[in-house]
From Swiss-Prot:
InterPro entries xref list: G_retro_matrix (IPR000840), G_retro_matrix_sf (IPR036946), Gag_p12 (IPR002079), Gag_P30 (IPR003036), Retrov_capsid_N (IPR008919), Retroviral_Gag-Pol_poly (IPR050462), Retrovr_matrix (IPR010999)
Organism whose genome encodes this protein: Feline sarcoma virus (strain Gardner-Arnstein)
Biological process according to GO: virion assembly
Known glycosylation sites: 137
Protein name, as recorded: Glyco-Gag protein
Localization: Host cell membrane
Residues covered by region (Disordered): 174-285
Amino acid sequence: MSRASSGTATGARLFGISSVLGEYRVLIGDEGAGPSRSPSEVSFSVWYRSRAARLVIVCLVASFLVPCLTFLIAETVMGQTITTPLSLTLDHWSEVRARAHNQGVEVRKKKWITLCEAEWVMMNVGWPREGTFSLDNISQVEKKIFAPGPYGHPDQVPYITTWRSLATDPPSWVRPFLPPPKPPTSLPQPLSPQPSAPLTSSLYPVLPKSDPPKPPVLPPDPSSPLIDLLTEEPPPYPGGHGPPPSGPRTPTASPIASRLRERRENPAEESQALPLREGPNNRPQYWPFSASDLYNWKSHNPPFSQDPVALTNLIESILVTHQPTWDDCQQLLQALLTGEERQRVLLEARKQVPGEDGRPTQLPNVIDETFPLTRPNWDFATPAGREHLRLYRQLLLAGLRGAARRPTNLAQVKQVVQGKEETPA
C-alpha cells in the first residue's frame, strides 16, 4: 500500500498535480495554507512548477526561434550572391549599350539574357548559361551565327559582336573576370644527331667526308625569266665573281620583283586601304574581302529584289564584323546588288544624312561630305576617319531598309487582264 502511494506521488509530482492541489487549497483558503492569492497568480505558479508546462513552453519558444534563425541565415547567404559574366554585364548595362552603339548596333536587355541563357547554350558549343569572356567560346558561337544560308542567325550578330568587344577590349570591371591566358605551347627541340667519332685504323688512312654538291637555286641559264620571290636575299649565282663593272648600271626588274622590293623597303607605305582590324602590338591591319567570300554570300542568299530583309540582315552582319572601308562597301554592293538596286539604295541613304539638329538635311555639301559618291580621303588611322566610316555604314544600312520598302508597281498591275471565263471576284 505504501509502495502504490509512493508511485502515485511520484507521478503527481511529475505532472504537477501536487502543486495544483496545494494551490487549490491556498485558493479556497484552507487552514494553514497561508493568505489567499488571485487566480492569475495561482495559474502562473502552477505553470511555473509543472514540468510538462515548462516543456511545452520550451517547445513553443523553439518553434518560433528556428524559423527566425533559418530566415536570417538564408538572407545572409542570398546577400553573398556569386557574380557571373552575365550578371556583371547586366549590372553595367548602360556601358554595354554604349559599347554596342559605338559599333553601330543596338542591343536589348531581354534578348541579351535570352541568348546567353538559352539560345547559345542550345548550340552545344560549350557556351555556359552564366556567360563567359573566353574568346574560344565566343568564336564557336560566331561560327554558328555566321553560318551561310538558312543556318545562320543574322539577328544575333550585334550581341555576339558586343561580347567579343568586351573580351578583346575589356573595361576595368571586366578584367578581373577574364580567363587566364593560355601558356604558349613550346614544341620539343629535335634531337640533333651526335657526330660519330672517326674510325681509327693503323692500316687505312682516315679521309675527311666531303659534303655533296648542292644544286643551284637558279637555273644555269642567266636569261631565264624565273625569279625566286620567296627569299629575302637573292641566291648565289653560279660561276666565279667577276670584276665590278666600270660604270653604274641599273638592271630592268620585272613588275612583280619591283613591287616586292618596294614593299620591303617601304613597309609604312604598303597600302593606302587603311586597316580595319587590330593586329600584333595593337596595330590595325587591312583584311579585304576575298573572291570566295563574295561568291558564297551571293550564291547562298536570295537576291535583294526577292527577299530584301534577308539580304539586308546579311549586309548588316558583314558591316558589323568586318567594318569595311568605303572601297569595300562599293565592292560589296556591286557583288550583291544590281545596278538599279545600288542606285536606289544610295539615293535612300543620302536622304537620311543628318544635319546639325540631328534631322535629315537637304544641304548638298553636307550630304556629299557625309555620304560621298566618289572615293573620299578618310584616314582610318585617325578618330575622325573612323567616325566618318561608322556613320557611312549606318547610312548605308538605312538606305538598304528604305529601298526595301518599294512602292507598288502600277505598270505590272495594269498588265493583269481578266480572262473570258474568270469572274470579277
